[in-house]
Amino acid sequence: MLHYAVVFLVIALIAALFGFGGIAAGAVGIAKILFFVFVIMAVVTFVLSLLKRG
């Protein structure tokens, strides 16, 4: 489960690069939305991973 949290975090960082860095001007809105979606997914899977261990 922790593996998924790391994967979602990496995807969020890549989306942030495109969205906030101005690399893909046409897809800025989508990249910003994807960034927040994947950050939330990373946090949720990280918390679930911690709850499963304890």
Swiss-Prot record:
It is found in: Cell membrane. It is a multi-pass membrane protein. The keyword Ribonucleoprotein does not apply. It comes from the Bacteria. Keywords: Cell membrane, Membrane, Transmembrane, Transmembrane helix. GO terms for cellular component: plasma membrane. InterPro entries: DUF1328. The chain crosses the membrane at residues 5-25, 28-48. The keyword Transmembrane applies. Belongs to the UPF0391 family. NCBIfam families: PRK13682.1-1 (NF010226), PRK13682.1-4 (NF010229). This is UPF0391 membrane protein Aave_3864. The lineage of its organism: Bacteria, Pseudomonadati, Pseudomonadota, Betaproteobacteria, Burkholderiales.
